[in-house]
Amino acid sequence: MNIGEKILLLLKEEIPEIEYNRYIKHLTYDTKKSTADNAIFYVPNSLVLSWIKNRYSSKIKHLFEIQNSIKVDVSILLKNQVESKKAEQKSVQKQQHSLLNPSHTFENFMVGGSNQFAYAAVKSVSEKAGVLYNPLFIHGGVGLGKTHLMQAAGNVFQNQGKVVIYTTVEQFLNDFIRHVRNKTMERFQEKYRKCDVLLIDDIQFLSNKEGIQEEFFHTFEALKGVGKQIILTADKHPKKIAGLEKRLQSRFEHGLVADIQPPELETKIAIIENKCKINKVILTKDIIHYIATVIESNVREIEGILSKLHAYSQLMHVDIDLQFTKNVLKDQLQENRANLTLDIITQNVAKDLNIKPSEIRSKGRSKNLVYARRIAIYLCRELTQNTMPQLAQYFGMQDHTAISHTLKKIGELMQNDEDFKVKIEELTNKITSSS
């Protein structure tokens, strides 16, 4: 017999039998949650709850204190409310879990020099939550893999049985507003402060929102104070987020700040090959190199391009070759390169070859200058919509036949010299990534 049952027997001796049978016998003692100084009972309905609280809660408290020789708090709760709350918590957890994309794993994240540090940091945190780097702040441009890495850690934590909440700042804000309107802030705070791991995307959108920054600060402190892991992403370093409170900026920097840079050519090639494998798209090495060379740094753009190529191929019943790829991506590449100018391309070539832009456009005929000029002309033709006469005028040539001759020479080199081809691809990648 537990202490709760013993108290009810003592109470039975002191009250009328009819009252005991009608009300007291329905009390259920919670042996798991009750402690020596805190007794918890459940009742089946509000009528019994009201009657016992009004008439016998003080008596029950007195009997407990006699038995335990210490002051005891007695809680009498409605059973279906407790069960409803548990169900709601499970529903919330399930909903948050479902927001994690199961395909975002460490295994299918392509690691290169541009993201190696961030990858290593997130991987380490997933192995020792709340111990190594807390918070972990990941920043970088759109489509570089911040969310993938964050959710990869979330999936690991979830598989360990931890309660993981993944959300964006926008969702966090909407949730906050809804609970304020409904006067249920306790539920909001319990939801976000009782989890084991909090993952929040796009933290820069806290900017200039004082009320939500205040609430997030207290949520952050509550979780950090008990060693719960926090991972945040943003498009820039905490110091560069305008309108972010100094105390939040300080706490974000107190953990580890890791950045992700645009992928270099080799990483883009690896990403394309991996996406082809996942999506069962067959591309030749030349096409993969072409896509990696001409697209910008956004990894999401790679996925879109592969989907577009696959769809065109299926609908038009044609094989995907290099010319087909160029035709399909023509409009998209023009849009991407709208900001590229002849000056920008020439400056990039000059910088790469350690000469002055003015020398490339000069009449100089030294071997180095001719080599640099030919590369600049080829890239200007490939990366802009300028005509050959326009290029001839820009580079100080008499007419477009000289441009045509240069393009032919570079084309031959690209076919016969693999090292030169790689050089052009890397230079193209630098120019398009920085535009």
Swiss-Prot record:
GO CC, sorted alphabetically, is: cytoplasm; plasma membrane
Region of interest (Domain IV, binds dsDNA), ranges: 314-435
**GO terms of biological process kind:** DNA replication initiation; regulation of DNA replication
Residue span of region Domain I, interacts with DnaA modulators? 1-70
Judging by the UniProt lineage, the source's domain of life is: Bacteria
Xref: Pfam families: Bac_DnaA, Bac_DnaA_C, DnaA_N
Tell me where it mainly resides: cytoplasm
- Keywords assigned by UniProt, alphabetized: ATP-binding, Cytoplasm, DNA replication, DNA-binding, Lipid-binding, Nucleotide-binding
Q: Where is this region: Domain II?
A: 70-98
Localization recorded for this chain is: Cytoplasm
> Can the keyword ATP-binding be found in this entry's annotation?
yes
Outline what the protein does: Plays an essential role in the initiation and regulation of chromosomal replication. ATP-DnaA binds to the origin of replication (oriC) to initiate formation of the DNA replication initiation complex once per cell cycle. Binds the DnaA box (a 9 base pair repeat at the origin) and separates the double-stranded (ds)DNA. Forms a right-handed helical filament on oriC DNA; dsDNA binds to the exterior of the filament while single-stranded (ss)DNA is stabiized in the filament's interior.
Spell out the subunit comment.
Oligomerizes as a right-handed, spiral filament on DNA at oriC.
Q: Which PANTHER family match?
A: CHROMOSOMAL REPLICATION INITIATOR PROTEIN DNAA
Q: Which family does it belong to?
A: Belongs to the DnaA family.
Q: What is known of its domains?
A: Domain I is involved in oligomerization and binding regulators, domain II is flexibile and of varying length in different bacteria, domain III forms the AAA+ region, while domain IV binds dsDNA.
* Name under which the protein is recorded: Chromosomal replication initiator protein DnaA
Species annotation: Sulfurimonas denitrificans (strain ATCC 33889 / DSM 1251) (Thiomicrospira denitrificans (strain ATCC 33889 / DSM 1251))
Q: Which gene encodes it?
A: dnaA
